[in-house]
Amino acid sequence: MADKQKIKVLVVDDEPNIVEILKYNLQKEGYEVATAEDGHKAVKTAIKFQPDVILLDIMMPNQDGVETCLQIRQIPELKHAFIIFLTARLEEYSEVAAFDVGADDYITKPIKPRALMSRIAALFRRDSKKEQEKGQIKIRDLNVDRSSYTIDKAGKTITLPKKEFELLYFLANNPNVVYSRDELLHNIWGSDVFVLARTVDVHIRKVREKIGEEY
């Protein structure tokens, strides 16, 4: 994991007490912390602060976390930031919506600071392992480049959120192998993140929509 002194965390929640608790515990662990109380301010702060991790509440007035995540994922300089949703909602569609717009993890309230720190550390561990697997894969006119997280199809650049890219790269790197949903969840999201099997279906559908059904 990278040096915590250099890791920036943006906390976004409309409940001041939650923001203060998370800020206190993150700073105690050595992270640099910025905060925002709504989605609009979160996007502006993220552009200026350039966080490595964004803790994002789903249920916020004016602009919810899902829309905020979608906007952040469209900002090129923030495409590698980890986004962890914080929510009191347990419904399946909330989780699917979260991962559908590019979230990396999903934690329900009340949030236990120690558990949150472990989840953040786990994201960086998985990312570190993937950094060691950089390379390019070419399938007909499709070129998948992990070193730059870019996809080129017949000279046209295709942009995918991080998890969609990781899913495509993993499957392209293991051709002619059939994986179960559980195996894909383990390899892409990791065993320490609880994700519904339906999330895999959503990501595969979105990848196919963007690169074409022929692959």
What are these regions (language model features)?
Residues 7-8, 122-178, 182:
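Short, Lys/Arg-enriched segments at the junction into DNA-binding effector domains
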Residues 20-28:
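Charged docking surfaces used in two-component/phosphorelay signaling
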